Regions:
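Conserved CoA-thioester-binding segment of acyl-CoA-metabolizing enzymes
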Residues: 1-53, 90
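Amphipathic alpha-helical segments at domain termini/boundaries
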Residues: 1-17, 160, 164-199, 207-219, ...
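Terminal peptide-recognition signature
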Residues: 16, 33-34, 52, 65, ...
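A general structural signal for well-ordered alpha-helical segments in protein cores
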Residues: 31, 66, 144, 153-157, ...
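Catalytic-core regions built around general acid/base machinery
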Residues: 37, 84-96
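Glycine- (often His-adjacent) and acidic-residue-rich active-site loop
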Residues: 54-88
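Crotonase-fold acyl-CoA enzyme core
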Residues: 91-109, 114-203
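Intrinsically disordered, low-complexity segments enriched in small/flexible residues
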Residues: 227-231, 235, 247
Length: 252
């Protein structure tokens, strides 16, 4: 079964759902579809707020697709793949609507980047996070600016350097990544429903201005994240990285 992106609109709330059978890991085509869907709902007048979620209960997003990573054989293909996450982050940044992320399970790599790029992120208590890129021979170059903006430089460095260790949802809340955490998915969904309805009836012009203020200083990310994608694209070509990814896959 292939992955998919779907969306629906109800009472001013646009909900985008993504899915991939491999723990919601994201191949390049899904990343581009997700970025396009975020941009589309951002431009849809009847949408006042966006909720971003994934299917299942164990994993919010496992980051990049290892199958695609291993298949990368040239720099341009590598840059193209990693620019997918850049497109998603920039779409979230530029959408003139607040984006609420629903993190119902663990987040790895690019998944942490997506959670960090939302304007308000809810999570359950078992939604641990990990930036595992260094463990497979690359680095969190593309998602780094979004994660660092949310949790600060010290916490970002901790996640990046200690690439094999999970950090708890409580840690992520303490650092500012998660706005609130819940024991169950059902409790989280109630809170998301309450906030999204409040925002759907709030002043759209005020929210547009607030979003611009909140993201001030990121205007250069269109070019920055593509430069970062090229860095990851170059590293993924090395024998070290290919061997590390293969070893990681065999453990999984």
């Amino acid at each position: 079964m292939e992955g998919y992106i779907k969306s629906d609109i109800k009472d001013g709330v646009g909900t985008i759902t993504f899915f991939h059978p491999q723990s919601n890991s994201m191949p390049g085509n899904l990343l581009r579809q997700l970025a396009a869907e975020i941009a589309k709902l951002g431009d849809t007048i009847e949408v006042k707020v966006i909720v971003l979620k994934s299917e299942g209960e164990k994993s919010f997003c496992a980051g990049a697709s290892f199958d695609e990573l291993i298949a990368i054989n040239d720099l341009e293909t590598g840059k193209h793949f990693f620019s997918g996450f850049a497109m998603v982050i920039n779409a979230m940044r530029l959408a003139p609507k607040f984006i609420i992320a629903r993190v119902q399970g663990k987040a790895v790599g690019g998944g942490v980047g997506i959670a960090s790029s939302a304007d308000y992120t809810f999570a359950v208590k078992n939604a641990s996070i990990k930036l595992s890129e260094l463990a497979v021979g690359i680095g969190p170059f593309v998602v780094g600016p979004a994660v660092e903006r949310k949790v600060g430089t010290a916490a970002f460095c901790q996640l990046t350097i200690n690439a094999t260790e999970w950090q708890s949802a409580d840690w992520a809340k303490e650092k500012g990544l998660y706005a609130d955490t819940f024991e169950t998915i059902a409790e989280m969904d109630v809170a998301i429903d309450i906030l999204s309805k409040k925002l759907a009836s709030s002043n759209p012009e005020a929210m547009i201005m607030l979003k611009q203020v909140m993201w001030k200083g990121t205007e250069h990310w269109d070019s920055l994240l593509l430069e970062r994608a090229a860095m990851s694209g170059a590293l993924v070509l090395s024998d070290f990285t290919k061997n590390a990814i293969n070893a990681f896959k065999q453990k999984a």
